[in-house]
Structure formats: C-alpha cells, structure tokens
Amino acid sequence: MTAIIDIHGREILDSRGNPTVEVDVLLEDGSFGRAAVPSGASTGAHEAVELRDGDKGRYLGKGVTKAVAAVNGDIAEALVGLDAEDQREIDMAMIDLDGTPNKSRLGANAILGVSLAAAKAAADARGLPLYRYVGGVSARTLPVPMMNIINGGEHADNPIDVQEFMIMPVGAGSIAEAVRWGSEIFHTLKKGLSQKGLATAVGDEGGFAPNLASTRDALDFIAASVDQAGFKLGTDVVLALDCAATEFFRNGKYEISGEGLSLSPEQMAEYLAALVKDYPIKSIEDGMSEDDFAGWKALTDLIGGTCQLVGDDLFVTNPARLEQGIKDGLANSLLVKVNQIGTLSETLDAVDMAHRARYSAVMSHRSGETEDATIADLAVATNCGQIKTGSLARSDRLAKYNQLIRIEEELGDMARYPGAAIFG
C-alpha cells in the first residue's frame, strides 16, 4: 500500500528568484508528499553538488532542468515500486544510482527533493505529521531560534564582513513567545535604523543590511534594540554570530577589510574571544575557514568551553567530516543543512553522530528558500533544540516559524521549549 507509483519533478523559483527543484511523490494508497529544495549563497567547498544547467541563455545559467530530468528519468525508474516507508533503501538506491562521492551526476538537489518528498508521502500514509513520523513519540522539543536580524558578508552589500548577527530568545517560555519577542526586537531595530538614516531594506534572509562601520557597531545596535524593546540582554535574549569566515580567508589570513584588519588564525581566535568577553555571544558559527583545522583547534581550545562553536562549512552535514572533526577536537556543534549532504538518511546520521559525541546540533535553512517548511518538522523530529531560519520578515522564513507554532500547539502540554538549557 505504501509502494511508490509516481515521482514527478518540476522547476520552480526560490526566494531569490532563482530556479530550484520541487518533487511530488505519489503512493499506491493515494498518499502524497511534496518537497522543494533550498539553495545557499555562501557554500562550502565540500558540500554535495547542486546540479545547474549552465545555459547562460536561460535563467543566466541557473536553470535546473537537468536535475528535474534526473528526477523524472533515472530516479523515478529506479524507485517506482519501492516502499516509501523504507527511507534508507530509497536514499541508498539514489546514492548508488548517482555513483559519485558528491552526488554530482544526478545532483544533490534532485536526490534531496525525492528523499524528502518520499518521507512526507510515507508520513501521509501513516496519518502522522512529519515530525512525529521521523522522530517518533519522543519528538517534542521545540527549537530555540537564531534570528538573523542584521546581515553582512555574502548576504549584504555593506562593509561588515561577519555574515549574520542573530538574537536568541532563550528567556521565552514557548516558541510562540520567542517568535513574538523576535518580532518586537526586529521592529524596534528597524525604527532605530530609520531614525539614524540607515537602510531598512531586508536581505536574503529577512535581516537588515545597514551601512554600519564594524562588527561591534552592529552588536551595539542590536543590544540597544533589545533594551528598547523591553528585554534584558544576556538573560532574556543572547546573541549569536555566523562569521562565514571561509569567505574572507585569503592566503592564510582573515581579511576583515571593513575594519582594515588582516589577522592570522591565532589573532582571529583572539578577535572572537574579545567579542565573547564583551557581549553575551553564546554561539559562533564558522569562526574559522572550512579547511583551517589549526585555526579551528585554536578557537575551540580558547573559547569552546564557554561558547557554542558551530561547524557549517567545516562539516557540511557530512558524517565523515564530522567524525574527523570530533576526533580532532574541532568545534562543539553541528549546523544541519539537508541540501549539504543530499538525503534525509545521511542528515539524520549526522545529527545522531553529533549527539553521541555530545556536540549540539542546529537545524538550518539556506539563503535561497521556498515556502517549504520541512526543516521546522526536522528540528522537532531530531530534538536538536535550535533552529536557524532567518529573520522576522519574508514569507519564506516565516513559513518555518509558523509551522513551529502549529507544532507546539499540536503537542500541547507535551511541548518543551528548552530556552537557555540548550547551552548546558
């Protein structure tokens, strides 16, 4: 009854107006699943390959008709007849069919679309929400959001090199309250920027991209907005950064050009340590470049005992890279992006490995998103306790927050919002 009878892919547009892959999976009993695949702007060199057409005469080369053809051709032919409830068999069949180490033949965007749509169809067949189908009866922890309210780096056209400045409403009592707090701080920040004559247009992830002078300038602006909104910085709300340091690592130096700095890995670690000392920053993502293992080790040794150090480009949601990082003592947290590895099974393997090593895990969106809210369900399914899904603007970001509010309501008294407990 849960055999796959049809798989259909199509080309749709993401939140940046670029093509992406959407997949429908239909089962023998009429159950149905649909998934749309996200896309990143700052991508790690070790991510699974997103297959693009390269035809400059169509969508400026960003079309995904090759990936869609893979879904409707090779993948559909291989998977029709398989049981949608056997997620690992489905995912392994696609990995074997692709036959490359980075999913470059069929495309991770094709493979992931099918993987997630099959899981949704299986959940539909069971009459279960996706978070319950994937996570079982223990799936009840709502994630604390990292809300990206000021953008720099690859996500903005301003002098700030750090890519994301985020607030985390750890003092809230529920996800619904956390979203309210975030919204109030977001609008307070907007008013403050406007009063200073600074831009209030939003970037890819819904955050503002004002022409501020430095990292500390951005942190001070956020701190003032938290206070003006009526919350206590360091207790109600803490801060988080995504440096995306790979983007400004050149010739062995971290070029923080907006501040006129050229730092060695050791100096970069000290730079971040000083920020953690002066502000209630509880989480730093990609504080070092993806292959600067010595830098990562220095940073982890320096502040890993007091600050969550999240590996995004470092680990790319890849169990093999994560395993090596754990052995080498690099970072203490895994950023989870389903399209970095390309299947649901491998994503869950990475989260499980992180948890067994006492690393935290943070479920994450990409800068190019859609209305698909799958990551909200996966955050609850994995009990990871944290989610990155942008600011309090743009419907592609709010779709995830709204889904979390619905899940919390559905769980009722079983729902748990961990707050500051996520940091131990």
UniProtKB/Swiss-Prot annotation:
Cofactor binding note of this UniProt entry: Binds a second Mg(2+) ion via substrate during catalysis.
Protein's cellular compartments: Cytoplasm; Secreted; Cell surface
InterPro entries membership: Enolase, Enolase-like_C_sf, Enolase-like_N, Enolase_C, Enolase_CS, Enolase_N
Pathway: Carbohydrate degradation; glycolysis; pyruvate from D-glyceraldehyde 3-phosphate: step 4/5
SMART domains found in the cross-reference section: Enolase_C, Enolase_N
Reactions this protein catalyses: (2R)-2-phosphoglycerate = phosphoenolpyruvate + H2O
Sequence similarity: Belongs to the enolase family.
Protein's name according to its UniProt entry: Enolase
Organism encoding this protein: Sphingopyxis alaskensis (strain DSM 13593 / LMG 18877 / RB2256) (Sphingomonas alaskensis)
Encoding gene (name): eno
